[in-house]
Structures are given as structure tokens and as C-alpha cells.
Amino acid sequence: MSAKTPEEVRNEQVIRSLYALVEGNAKDTSNFVSIFTDDGYFYDVAADKKYFGRDIGVTVDVYAAAFPDMHREIYTLRSFGDHVLVELSLNGTHKGDLVIPAGTIPPTGKVMRAPCCDVFRLKDGRVFSFHCYVAVPILLEQLGVFMNLQAALRH
């Protein structure tokens, strides 16, 4: 394996900084959004929804409200040119409403440890695109609502 380029090293540092901004009580959505380019976006693949501008931070706030102790455990973080790939898990205790496209899941008190893969593309040290692939069926099963999602939802 060849050595990382200075751009790849910088890109990895940018992504580690991005994750640090959304950890538990230290959550700083405004600074999280500021790391994106003006034309950048966040793509929540499971919901098939792209967010632009200030809305990039919406899912950060949704998950922070539902899981106030939210922590992202990074297993693998690798850069390839202007791309950074991250394998991680989203971890936390479900203590608040979880708003999803189908409705709202009230707090269950259960622990989530959902597998996730994030794919970033950077331009000049800022995030242009962030595609987030969360294993939603596993997340819903961990909350105890997967097999009976309709009964668990508030509309």
C-alpha cells in the first residue's frame, strides 16, 4: 500500500473533526454544517433524502434528540484521493422521540448500536458530499419495533 498523500491526510483529519462536532453533549450543528462547501449536501440514503445548506444538520439534531448520549464508534476510516470511507456504528440510548419519514417512535429506553457506512467527497478541505448508509432494519430491531413498526408509530 502506498503512502497517503497530504490531501488524503488532511481529508481524514477533516472527517474526524466533523464527527467530533456531533458527539453527545458536545454537539455543534452549526459548525458541523460550516465544514460543507456552499454547494455541498448530506444524503440520508435510508430515507432517500438529500439536505442542502442549513438543512444539512437536520438529521444530526433528530438523532441527538432521540439519543442524547449518541456516540459514533469508528472502526475503519480510509481516504482515497478526494474520498473518505468510514465504517462505524451509531450508539446511544433511545430517550427521546425518533422522527422518521413514516412517523415518530416514542422513547423505548433501549440501546442502539446500528452499523453504518459513510462516504464523503471533499473539495479543498471541505465536505462536498456525505452519503450516509445506516442499517435501519437493525436499528429498528434494536429498539424493539421492527416487526411491528406500525403499532409503534405515533402519527
What are these regions (language model features)?
Residues 71-72, 112-117:
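Short, surface-exposed coil-to-beta transition loops
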Residues 115-135:
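A contiguous, mid-protein "functional segment" used to position or interact
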Residues 128-155:
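Low-complexity, intrinsically disordered terminal/linker segments enriched in charged
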Residues 11, 29-96:
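A solvent-exposed, acidic/Ser-Thr-rich amphipathic alpha-helical stretch
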Residues 5-6, 105, 140-145:
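A short acidic/glycine-rich loop-to-helix N-cap element
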